[in-house]
Amino acid sequence: MGQPEGLERFDSPGKGRGLKATRSFALGELLFTCPAYTYVLTDTERGNHCDFCFARKEGLSKCGKCKQAFYCNVDCQKGDWPMHKLECSAMCSYGQNWCPSETVRLTARILAKQKTQTERTPSETFLSVKEFESHLSKLDNEKKELIESDIAALHRFYSKNLHYTDNAALVFLFAQVNCNGFTIEDEELSHLGSAIFPDVALMNHSCCPNIIVTFKGTVAEIRAVQEIHAGDEVFTSYIDLLYPTEDRNDRLMDSYFFTCDCRECSTKQKDPAKLEIRKLSDPPSHQTVKDMIKYARNIVEEFRRAKHYKTPSELLEMCELSLDKMGSVFVDSNVYMLHMMYQAMGVCLYLQEWDGALKYGEKIIKPYSKHYPAYSLNVASMWLKLGRLYMGLEKTTIGTKALKKALAIMQIAHGPDHHYIAEIKKELEL
């Protein structure tokens, strides 16, 4: 099993392990692909996507026993059985009470795979799952308690089919999954599932990444979004890059236990535009701005929690009230305004309030293009959503323009032969 050409694992100064280019890669060029070591389709996409290959199609066939897993055909069903058998009978016996989290489901699959797979897999040419960083010593009590509740769920839902190692080994594995797991997303950045991609996990983070990770089914594809020269380290981004430096580093420290020293974090060059305030004849005081940033950070977190218990209408009202309040100090292109507009747009799409969704999307797209790096999937997916909204509302001229903007980014990020590209080209022919 050979390593991809033009790349090598190395010790990155101050960062630990990393991946380095040993030749040049052009913009849009594929560096390598990595099949998922294990993966799981998210509950809400059941019936829309095949549980095995993640293909999106109508008329998928149900598992005859549990009626909860869906497949393209018999081959996909057989391919998935080694993993689905961990859950099939438990789904039947627990019925509505079968509710392990996605992390628990993914970890159960890792344990099952490790039982049968003793050799290194094609997903581990640079880095093996056993080498994953866990940051166990850095976990606070809250994170440890979450892991313990995941372990309890693992015992509850999987004890018939999995024989566990001791508790300490499970804590270690869950900590590894929390730091090294990936979410698989579609072309509009909707969540499709969770997966482990060991070779992708080797790459270090930068807020100015030179590659982008996209997905073709359950395979990760890594392409250059800047020219890469021999000797350059290959950097991905672990987080959403919309936010200002302090927020990005808080998120990195909370999830991955480090802060970033990339060019963007050192210069904070984009922060003034990201945090721009209104130019008023009576400018707000420094304290007023500080208080509003604090309010904005709190409302972002509050909204994230509210999604689990509030109705869509209540969520939309929450967005509108916060936008009114922040709008007295922040300009519309301020990232906290954009964050709440994006949430509001999502609620409007869910409620099928197309005009409302369009209103927010139109305000978001221009600042997104400024705040995000070139060839950003966040920008591409926003153009795509807008294009599809325009087309649905029979505004074909402007819809065509928006879809073409999405296409221009995606041809670099996803590669010209990706099935998403073919689908969008088909939409442009209508």
UniProtKB/Swiss-Prot annotation:
GO BP annotations listed: negative regulation of cell population proliferation; negative regulation of transcription by RNA polymerase II; peptidyl-lysine dimethylation; peptidyl-lysine monomethylation; regulation of DNA damage response, signal transduction by p53 class mediator
Binding positions for Zn(2+) 2?
C63, C66, H84, C88
Listed binding positions for S-adenosyl-L-methionine are K15, G16, R17, H135, N204, H205, Y256, F257, F258
User: Where does the UniProt annotation locate this protein?
Assistant: Cytoplasm, Cytosol; Nucleus
Q: Where does the protein principally reside?
A: cytoplasm
Source organism superkingdom: Eukaryota
UniProt-listed Gene3D superfamilies: 1.10.220.160, 1.25.40.970, 6.10.140.2220, SET domain, Tetratricopeptide repeat domain
**What does it catalyze?**
L-lysyl(4)-[histone H3] + 3 S-adenosyl-L-methionine = N(6),N(6),N(6)-trimethyl-L-lysyl(4)-[histone H3] + 3 S-adenosyl-L-homocysteine + 3 H(+); L-lysyl-[protein] + S-adenosyl-L-methionine = N(6)-methyl-L-lysyl-[protein] + S-adenosyl-L-homocysteine + H(+)
Q: What is its EC number?
A: 2.1.1.-, 2.1.1.354
Know the name of this protein?
N-lysine methyltransferase SMYD2-A
Q: Which organism is it from?
A: Xenopus laevis
